Regions:
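Cross-family detector of peptidyl-prolyl cis-trans isomerase
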Residues: 2-139
Length: 139
């Protein structure tokens, strides 16, 4: 009986520690690092996220920042109005959290690049701070 209880306890602990790993499976082409933890509710698909961001090419050249524009940027998470790396990388953030996203070109601007500031096939780095969440009212 002792052996059975030990095995049950071991398996329970193994599941508890393995579950977060399984739930946060890596997304091909996207590396997420948490620079500062946030608090409260998580952003979900359909919510509006208000963020400050700075974006760099991998050579370190900054190409854009909401702080340079003097105001945060808002978008509907998962709505396809931003690059796919953002839709995937911002989902699950909490208010106050700062994430660094390293995004392969196929989840960014791909073969076309963007406006001369981002060359074709560019891997990008973003620091994104979640300032506020407006929850989606739909069920």
């Amino acid at each position: 009986m002792k052996t059975f209880l030990k095995r049950s306890l071991f398996l329970s602990l193994a599941l508890v520690f393995a579950l977060p790993i399984a739930l946060s499976a890596p997304i091909k082409g996207l590396k997420i690092s948490i620079i500062k933890k946030g608090k409260g509710a998580e952003v979900k698909k359909g919510d509006t996220a208000k963020v400050h961001y700075t974006g760099w090419l991998m050579n370190g050249k900054k190409f854009d920042s909401s702080k340079d524009h003097g105001q945060p940027f808002e978008f509907s998470v998962g709505g396809g109005r931003v690059i796919q790396g953002w839709d995937l990388g911002v989902e699950g953030m909490k208010v106050g959290e700062v994430r660094r996203l390293i995004i392969d070109s196929d989840l960014a601007y791909g073969k076309t690049g963007a406006g001369g500031a981002i060359p074709p096939n560019s891997k990008l780095k973003f620091d994104i701070e979640l300032l506020a969440i407006s929850k989606n009212a739909a069920p």
